[in-house]
Structure formats: C-alpha cells, structure tokens
Amino acid sequence: MTGPGPEINKEEHPSSPGKKQITYNSIPKNANLIDGSTNSSKRPIEKYDKRIADPTKSYFPHSISRTPRRKYTYILVLTSLNGTFESKHVVIPFKPDGLKLGRPVANSNSSSSSSLRGGKRVDSHTFSQVRSDNGNFDSRVLSRNHALLSCDPLTGKVYIRDLKSSNGTFINGQRIGSNDVEIKVGDVIDLGTDIDTKIEHRKISATVEELFVQPLLESPIFENEDSDDCHTITEKEEAAAITSHIYGDSNNLELEEVILGSDTEILSGIFINNCIGTSPTLSNIIKTLAMEIPFSKCDNFKLQSMENFLINYTTHLEYTNKLLVEKNDQQLVKLQNGLRRKLSGKYEKIIEQNRNQVKQLERDHMFFKKSFEVKKRRNNEKQKSMEREIEDLKTRLEVERYKNSQMMKKNKQKEQELSTASKKKTTEHDTRGVPGMNPKGTDKFSIKNTLCNHFTLLTFGTISIGIIAIVFKILSPN
C-alpha cells in the first residue's frame, strides 16, 4: 500500500544552475500507511521518522533540522502503594529524550517559607516542584537523578532504566541496571528502599495503573469562538485522531513537513532565481497544490488497496467457506467415530455383564430345581411312612377300643353277678339269724376288691387311648 518515492529531477534549472528542481508527485517510500484491519490495543507507530531516515535532507540544502511534530503522546498513570505520593499522570517523551524520576533539587537562593503537610514540615519550594504531572517525589531515599522513563517511537513500548542511584530501582521486586527494561500495566515500580518509618525516609512504591495514548489534535479556530474553547479536545476529535492515524489520513504533519520543508523553501527554488514575484496568494496556491497532489495520490493508493482487499476477500470467501465446511465435516466424522467407539465399547461391556448374570441365574435355577426335587422326594417318602404308621396306629386303636368294650361288658356282668350274690346273702342272713356273725362285713370287702380291679382296668384303657391319640396327632400331616 506504499507509493513510490519522490522523483528527483537532476536536470538543472536553465536560469539557476546552482538549484535542483524537485517535483512532488508521490509520497515517500518509507511513509508506511497502516491498514485498518489491525486490532492492536495500542495505536500503531508510523515507521516513517525524520530522525531516522529523511530523504529530503540531501535535497533541501536550506532545510532546518527540527523535531517532527507528532499527533499523539503516551500518558503513564502511577498509583502509590504505600501512600507516599498522590497519583501521577506523566507524559513519556520519545527517545532519545526521557523523563527523569527522582528527588527535586532544592533552591538555596530563594527564601522559601515552610508549611506542614502530612504531619511533617515541607519547604514550599520543594512542594511546588512535586506535582502530579512530573517525575519528582518527596522522599530522601531517592537520588536527584534516580531513574529515567522513555518511549520507543517505532514500537510504542515504554522503558525504564536506573541512573546509577544509591538505593536502586526495582521492577516487580527485581533490581534493574542501566539497561532499558520494558514496563507494562500492572507492574510494580519501587524507587529506593525503606530506611525509617517516617514518610520522608520511605521508598516510593507505585504500580502502573494505566498506559494510554493521548491524541494531540487541536480544534479548528473560528472567528466567533473564544480561544479557550478552540483548544479543547472533544471526544469526536479524539476518535477522529485515532481513525486518522489507523487509516493513514491525509492530515499527516510529518508528510506536510517533508513536502514543504520550511515555509519558503519550494518558492525560493522555483521563483527566486527566475526573478518572478512571489505574491502571498500565489504562494498559498502553490503550497496548497504541492500538499494536495501527494495526499490525493495517497488516498488513491489507499482506495486501490482497499479495492484489492475486497476483491481478494470476495474471491477467497467461497474457497474459505468450502475449507471450513470440509474441516467441520472431518471434525464431525472424527467426533462421530470416537463417540461410536466409546458407546460400542460401553454397550458391549453392559451386554457381557447381562449375559453373565443370565447364565448365573440359570445355574442357580437348575440348582434350586434339583434341590427342590430332592426335598420333594424325601418329603413324599416321609409322608408315606407316616401314613403307614397312622394306619397301624388306627388299627391298634380299634383293637384297644374293642378290648376296652369287652372289658366293660365283663365288668358289668360281674357287677350284676355280685349284686345278685349280695342280695342272696342278705336274704340268707336274715333267715338264718345266726348270732355273733356279721355277714355284711365280708360282703363289703369282696365288693371293694372287685371295684378296685375294674377301676384299674378302666384307667389302663384310658391311658392307652390317650397315648394312641397323641401319637396320631403328632404323626398326622398338617
């Protein structure tokens, strides 16, 4: 996206043999135009720097060496970690310049008054030198030239280095030397070491809270506006400055200096040796044309690059989409295969476990079935034996009942015989009337013996019947 360099016509002017004719029909080669597709958090630094390579120095013998005007500056915000200072917003100069950090130099000639601040007496001159926008700190453990902050104009990185201080400079607890060390947001910077608990003898401990770019775009001055309002930078102007820097807008002060040099450089080369009058209007027109021509070509180059980018984007969009679809399909196939393998292995394990469980259940079923058949056969045999015993006991019971009934009949017959015999004896006794004889006594004795015999037989029969009934009840099935 860079255009060709300035074309130098080395043919001498006919009326001025000592001058060289310069035609500004393009921008310099090393004026890098930044593409708008960058996503860097910091604003990119233009690679063109007059202090590094300025092709116009060899062609403008009357040019004045001066520091190029920049459209931005870096702001560093430091916040105290031990309450030794208030938050500072300092501007970081570009190399080879730098911002010194240290203790302010006391002015012995001025009769300054003293005041109390934070419980200690502070000289008013020293206090005036310690501000929130400079690198001075009110601490006696710091050297006057303690450390140096600087910014690289090419990379935009902020560096710090120690200036051979007595108590040292520390970054995140590591002491640094005289070489540049990059600092970033969140780093802890310690200047010096604690000597005493007093505030003036404590080290400066700070953290890099923020590091941002501040655009230096001024508002346009109108006739009906105040000067204070003209120097205020609105949010729209800051956004315009950032956009201008990212997309390489034509309002580039460095290109303007390259094109025009000093105010009268081009005009002196064109008109002075030709003895042509240089009116202010003609001078302004020529300067405007000299500025607008390369800026217009720069815009054309940017438009061409954007057109090429859009053509390439639309050309490769379909191919990129196809590649993405193929990649997604391959990834999907891989995921499906992996999932299938994982699930198949899992299901195979589950099926194998179920098969083993079924086989175990079948074995248990056969075992229980066989044991049940054995128990059933044994129970049947026991039942048959018990039935035979019951039948045997039943026959015995019938026999005993029959015997008992026969004995009862015999007992009744004997009782009847005894009763009849006793009646006969009583009648005989009454008829005989034998004195001194008591026949009733002998009859009573014989009757008692007969009753005892009958009772013994009855008891024996009852006990036999009870024993047979108990055995029958025990051996009978449920």
From Swiss-Prot:
Spans within the Cytoplasmic topological domain: 1-454
Lineage: superkingdom: Eukaryota
GO biological process terms held by the UniProt record: cellular response to pheromone; re-entry into mitotic cell cycle after pheromone arrest; regulation of cell cycle
Matching Pfam families: FHA
Location(s) in or outside the cell: Membrane
Residue intervals passing through the bilayer: 455-475
Protein name: Factor arrest protein 10
Organism: Saccharomyces cerevisiae (strain ATCC 204508 / S288c) (Baker's yeast)
Gene from which the chain derives: FAR10
